[in-house]
Regions:
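Short gly/ser/thr-rich secondary-structure transition/capping motifs
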Residues: 9-11, 76-77, 162-166
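Iron-sulfur cluster-binding cysteine motifs and their immediate structural context
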Residues: 38-45, 64-84, 91-107
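Conserved AdoMet/S-adenosylmethionine-binding subsite of the radical SAM
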Residues: 111-260, 266-267
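Short cysteine/histidine-rich metal-coordination sites, predominantly Zn2+-binding motifs
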Residues: 53-58, 78-85, 105-118
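Auxiliary Fe-S-binding modules of radical SAM enzymes
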Residues: 1-22, 225-303
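Short glycine-enriched, charge-decorated loop/helix-capping segments at active-site entrances
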Residues: 54, 195-201, 269-277
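Flexible, acidic/Gly-rich N-terminal and inter-domain linker regions that tether
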Residues: 1-62, 66
Length: 303
C-alpha cells in the first residue's frame, strides 16, 4: 500500500497519553461525526471541513487576517455575519502573529501519521501501549481509518478504537478485526431520549454492540455520565443489563461529564448549554458503580 496516497482529515495527534487503552499511547482524533451530542467536548470535530477557532483574548486588531482573507472578514471572526462568510481556507491562521486563530482540521497521509508514530516506538514497546483512534468519529473516514490501522497492525502495535458505534458493521468489519480493544459509547438506553440529546436514535448502536459481542470482541462500553440526562439509576441499570446480556466479558466505564470544551464553543462562535448539564458527585458516581456491579458487570476506568 502506498501510504502517501490515502489521506484523512485529522483534528490532532495527542502524544504520550495514558488514557483510552493500555500503556503510553498516541490518540489520533479524526474529524467528522454523525452524532451531535449537546454536551460534546470536541465541537470542532463535528464536521470534516476545517473551521477556524478565534481566541478573542489574543487578538490585537492588527488587521493582518483581513488583509489575506479572500472574503475580507474582519478581525472579530465571531462578529454578526462574519462566520457565515468564512470558507476555512486558513490563510488568516498563517498571517496571525498573535496566534489568535487556529485551524481545526489538518489533512494528513497515512505515511505522515506513521512518521510521528515511529518516533514514539520505544515508548509503545516499553509500556505495552499503542494507538487509539478517536474523534469526532473515526469511522466517518473508513478508507483512511482502514489504511492507517492496517499499517499500524503491520508494525505490531496495540490498537484501540473509541467509537459512538453508529456505523455500518459490514463496511467496518475488516477494520474492527484489526483492533485489540473497542471503547463503545451508549449515551442513553431510551431510544427517544438518545435522539433528543444526540440527533440519532440508538437502534444501530445497540445492534452493533450486540453483534460485536457475539463475535467475542474485546469491548468496554462507556457512558458519558451526565446528571439530569442519563445519570439516573434506571438508565445505568438498563445499560448494565444490556452489557451483561451481550458482551462475554462485561465491562462498563462511567465517564463523568466535564465542561472542558466550553471555550471551544465560544471560539467557534457557538452557544454552549453548560447550565443544562451536571457532573455527578463522587457519592453519586460510587452509587452508580455499585448498581453496575450488582448487575454482574465490572466497573472499569481507563482515565
Amino acid at each position: 500500500m502506498d501510504t502517501d496516497v490515502v489521506k484523512g482529515k485529522i483534528l490532532q495527534l495527542q502524544h504520550y497519553s495514558v488514557n483510552d487503552g493500555d500503556g503510553i499511547r498516541t490518540i489520533v482524533f479524526f474529524a467528522g461525526c454523525p452524532l451531535h451530542c449537546r454536551w460534546c467536548a470536541n465541537p470542532e470535530g463535528l464536521q470534516v471541513k476545517n473551521r477556524i477557532l478565534y481566541i478573542a483574548s489574543r487578538c490585537v486588531g492588527c488587521g493582518r487576517c483581513t488583509a489575506v482573507c479572500p472574503r475580507q472578514i474582519g478581525c472579530d471572526l465571531n462578529a454578526p455575519g462574519e462566520r457565515e462568510k468564512c470558507i476555512g481556507c486558513g490563510a488568516c491562521v498563517t498571517a496571525c502573529l498573535e496566534h489568535a486563530r487556529k485551524n481545526t482540521v489538518t489533512e494528513m497521509t497515512v505515511g505522515q501519521v506513521l512518521e510521528w508514530l515511529e518516533k514514539e516506538m520505544i515508548f509503545f514497546r516499553e509500556s505495552g501501549g499503542g494507538v487509539t483512534y478517536s474523534g469526532g468519529e473515526c469511522t466517518q473516514q473508513p478508507e483512511f481509518l482502514h489504511a492507517l490501522a492496517q499499517s499500524v497492525y503491520d508494525l505490531g502495535l496495540d490498537q484501540a478504537m473509541e467509537t459512538s458505534g453508529y456505523f455500518s458493521l459490514e463496511k467496518l468489519q475488516a477494520t474492527l478485526d484489526l483492533m485489540d480493544l473497542l471503547f463503545m459509547d451508549i449515551k442513553h438506553m431510551d431510544r427517544d431520549k438518545h435522539r433528543q440529546y444526540t440527533g440519532v436514535d440508538n437502534e444501530l448502536i445497540l445492534k452493533n454492540i450486540a453483534a460485536l459481542g457475539a463475535q467475542k470482541k474485546n469491548i468496554v462500553v462507556r457512558i458519558p455520565t451526565i446528571m439530569g440526562i442519563n445519570g439516573d439509576e434506571d438508565n445505568i441499570r438498563r445499560t448494565a443489563r444490556f452489557v451483561k446480556q451481550h458482551i462475554p466479558n462485561p465491562r462498563l466505564e462511567l465517564l463523568p461529564y466535564h465542561s472542558y470544551g466550553a471555550d471551544k464553543y465560544r471560539q467557534l462562535g457557538l452557544s454552549y448549554e453548560e447550565s443544562a448539564f451536571r457532573r455527578p458527585s463522587e457519592e453519586e458516581l460510587d452509587l452508580l458503580k455499585k448498581i453496575v456491579e450488582a448487575e454482574g458487570v465490572e466497573p472499569v476506568s481507563f482515565r
